[in-house]
């Protein structure tokens, strides 16, 4: 019987990051049914987007893999919300689907500290000393001090094509049949969630001349600062549904397993199927769809926004009702997948089970949707699992300093009754935790945790010294009686416009130039946000002794009930109670100010 510090079950985006992070300082095994499926992108061939790119930049800052994989295999990059402020600007990178998985497998299989074990997990058994045995379906037993379960959509997975279903974790791959049982046996409340994927269409059957072309940004961007050589090679395109599309869907809703009642699982609110869009937004006469290549030389394109569980024969008619797709040939049909998830409020903020100490969960098993959310959780769970195995101090990531902290807080303290998607609107301090400064915020933590080496830390420190030098250069020069930073603060001026006036900057990378521009243009807003955050930090020490929580009308019912039951002594303790949300903490602070009860607990 072999043993490791950490065993990771699953090789998707969560499992990959968990193994990579844990292997920085522990012995790791990854249990997968088929090593050739590691790192696959089963849905859209892209990384990033609003709320998601911020997570990827943070994973990168903490020594993770996703940003590196995305940059290495990029074929199209765009900054979304570029006309808006830096708090919501988000990078989206289109990837070569097969190359992404191949690169992930190359890295994982080539790591000397990671053993890849082929098999299906059937059971989890405690060893009586704080560790675990992972038992496979063929009877093998593997020992680990900590286990990360990153099973994706595979736990009792069922795929649906119309009213026809079959046991699969995703198309063509068997489900994890037994892994739900030990979790349920321990008392975990399991729920059924559902997600879906669009059809893939033969590229040579599409009339691209009839589509709106969306070029890549002329200056490719990346998560690592080093986008791959093909990062601007391919455009994407846009089409839309038609009245005929909507008519076909409305007349055939009985063929949908969701609307026929066959699927009990809840689907993602922010990534609805095309059936849901037509039904829920019946007042819209069209829905925009994005046509994305699976690679530069691929024979397939992906219909972003057209996920469906309708029967294949109907999918043919639906796709051919779209402009540019009149002669389309579907190579892979859309489908829905239903699967088990745990109740994330039964986890700690390190994603460790409260019911099974030493068992960590990450990714879609925790009720999230998206590659980026999975990768972020994988990094946390893998790091925490390794630190537990080696009896090191627990990992702590703050909501106030990262999207990652918001994700953990939301999952564990709030929970979700539907697949959770990270969005910029969930983040209270988004002007402080931007995608452009993730390395500045988190590199030091990465070094402390053993995830980032000191050479990387020195490079980040040097980067921000150059940024500071750039800002000082603007402040020290004058043209027409005004300093460069004053010119740059004008809404109509970009950094290039300031340089055109004659201001000289030191040599800076594109990322450093962006950092200079953001810090100058938004200095007042950023300083105000930092003062607000500092005030909130001080407020966490305020005493709640004697507060009548039941009389505070602005609290949510759940928060009022839990605060009355737990009776926390400080605002910080109240913030740590599951079900007490950020809005409830704000309501408590308003109440304390109104009543004059602002003493600190000492």
Curated annotation (Swiss-Prot):
FAD binds at residues 10-15. NAD-binding protein involved in the addition of a carboxymethylaminomethyl (cmnm) group at the wobble position (U34) of certain tRNAs, forming tRNA-cmnm(5)s(2)U34. Belongs to the MnmG family. This is tRNA uridine 5-carboxymethylaminomethyl modification enzyme MnmG. Its cofactor is FAD. It comes from Deinococcus geothermalis (strain DSM 11300 / CIP 105573 / AG-3a). Keywords: Cytoplasm, FAD, Flavoprotein, NAD, tRNA processing. The lineage of its organism: Bacteria, Thermotogati, Deinococcota, Deinococci, Deinococcales. Signal peptide: none annotated. NCBIfam families: mnmG_gidA (TIGR00136).
């Amino acid at each position: 019987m072999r043993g490791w510090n950490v065993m990771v079950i699953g090789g998707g985006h969560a499992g990959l990051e968990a193994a990579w992070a844990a292997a920085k300082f522990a012995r790791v095994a990854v249990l997968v049914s088929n090593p050739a499926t590691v790192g696959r992108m089963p849905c859209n061939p892209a990384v990033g987007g609003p709320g998601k790119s911020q997570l990827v930049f943070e994973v990168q800052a903490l020594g993770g893999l996703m940003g590196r994989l995305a940059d290495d295999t990029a074929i199209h990059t765009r900054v979304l919300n570029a006309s808006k402020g830096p708090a919501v600007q988000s990078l989206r990178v289109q990837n070569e689907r097969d190359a992404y998985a191949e690169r992930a497998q190359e890295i994982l299989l080539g790591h000397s500290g990671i053993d890849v074990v082929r098999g299906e997990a059937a059971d989890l058994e405690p060893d009586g000393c704080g560790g675990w045995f992972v038992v496979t379906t063929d009877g093998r037993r593997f020992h680990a001090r900590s286990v990360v379960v990153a099973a994706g959509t595979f736990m009792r997975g069922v795929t649906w094509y119309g009213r026809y279903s079959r046991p699969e974790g995703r198309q063509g791959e068997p489900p994890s049949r037994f892994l739900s049982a030990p979790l349920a046996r321990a008392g975990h409340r399991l729920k059924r969630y559902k997600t879906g994927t669009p059809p893939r269409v033969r590229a040579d059957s599409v009339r691209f001349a009839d589509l709106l072309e969306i070029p890549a940004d002329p200056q490719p961007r990346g998560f690592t600062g080093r986008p791959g050589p093909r990062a601007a090679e391919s455009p994407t395109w846009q089409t839309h549904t038609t009245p005929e599309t909507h008519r076909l869907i409305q007349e055939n809703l009985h063929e949908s397993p969701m609307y026929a009642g066959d699927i009990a699982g809840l689907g993602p609110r922010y990534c609805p199927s095309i059936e849901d869009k037509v039904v829920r937004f019946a007042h819209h006469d069209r829905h925009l769809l994005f046509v994305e290549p699976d690679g530069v030389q691929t024979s397939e394109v992906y219909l972003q926004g057209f996920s469906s569980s309708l029967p294949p024969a109907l999918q043919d008619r639906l796709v051919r009702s779209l402009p540019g797709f009149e002669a389309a040939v579907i190579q892979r049909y859309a489908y829905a997948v239903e699967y088990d998830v745990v109740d994330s409020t039964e986890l700690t903020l390190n994603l460790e089970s409260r019911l099974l100490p030493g068992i960590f969960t990450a990714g879609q098993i925790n009720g999230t949707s998206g590659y980026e959310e999975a990768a972020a959780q994988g990094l946390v769970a893998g790091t925490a699992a390794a630190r537990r195995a080696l009896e090191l101090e627990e990992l702590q990531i703050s909501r106030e300093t990262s999207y990652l902290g918001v994700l953990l807080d939301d999952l564990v303290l709030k929970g979700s009754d539907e697949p959770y998607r990270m969005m910029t609107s969930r983040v209270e301090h988004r002007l402080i935790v931007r995608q452009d400064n993730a390395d500045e915020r988190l590199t030091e933590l990465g070094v402390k945790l053993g995830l980032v080496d000191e050479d990387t830390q020195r490079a980040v420190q040097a980067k921000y010294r150059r940024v500071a030098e750039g800002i000082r250069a603007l402040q020290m020069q004058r043209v027409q009686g005004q300093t460069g930073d004053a010119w740059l603060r004008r809404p109509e001026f970009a950094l290039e416009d300031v340089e055109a006036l004659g201001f000289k900057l030191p040599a800076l990378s594109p990322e450093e130039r962006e950092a200079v521009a953001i810090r100058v243009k938004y200095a007042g807003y950023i300083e105000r946000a930092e003062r607000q955050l500092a005030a909130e930090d001080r407020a966490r020490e305020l005493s709640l002794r004697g507060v009548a929580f039941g009389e505070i009308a602005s609290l949510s019912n759940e928060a009022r009930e839990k605060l009355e039951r737990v009776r926390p002594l400080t605002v910080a303790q109240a913030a740590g109670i599951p079900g007490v949300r950020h809005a409830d903490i704000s309501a408590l602070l308003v109440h304390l100010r109104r009543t004059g009860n602002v003493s600190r607990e000492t």
